[in-house]
Amino acid sequence: DDCIKPYGFCSLPILKNGLCCSGACVGVCADL
C-alpha cells in the first residue's frame, strides 16, 4: 500500500507527494 510503518495511525487522510493514507492505514504516507 502507500503507507510506511510504524509511526502511529493516520487519524485523518494525509496527502504527501500525491499519495494518501486513509484513517485505517497504520503509519504515514510513503515518501515516494
From Swiss-Prot:
Protein name: Delta-conotoxin EVIA
Primary localisation category: secreted
Amino-acid biosynthesis in keyword set: no
Molecular function GO terms recorded: sodium channel inhibitor activity; toxin activity
Disulfide-bond pairs as recorded: C3-C21, C10-C25, C20-C29
Upper taxonomic lineage: Eukaryota, Metazoa, Spiralia, Lophotrochozoa, Mollusca
GO cellular component: extracellular region
UniProt cross-references to SUPFAM superfamilies, sorted A to Z: omega toxin-like (SSF57059)
UniProt function note: Delta-conotoxins bind to site 6 of voltage-gated sodium channels and inhibit the inactivation process. This toxin inhibits sodium channel inactivation in neuronal membranes from amphibians and mammals (Nav1.2a/SCN1A, Nav1.3/SCN3A and Nav1.6/SCN8A) upon binding to receptor site 6.
Keyword list, A-Z: Amidation, Disulfide bond, Hydroxylation, Ion channel impairing toxin, Knottin, Neurotoxin, Secreted, Toxin, Voltage-gated sodium channel impairing toxin
Domain notes: The presence of a 'disulfide through disulfide knot' structurally defines this protein as a knottin.
Modified residues (Leucine amide): L32
Modified residues (4-hydroxyproline): P6
Stated family: Belongs to the conotoxin O1 superfamily.
Note: Negative results: does not affect rat skeletal muscle (Nav1.4/SCN4A) and human cardiac muscle (Nav1.5/SCN5A) sodium channels. Exists in two forms, due to cis-trans isomerization at 12-Leu-Pro-13.
Keyword Glycoprotein included in the entry's annotation: no
Subcellular localization: Secreted
Tissue: Expressed by the venom duct.
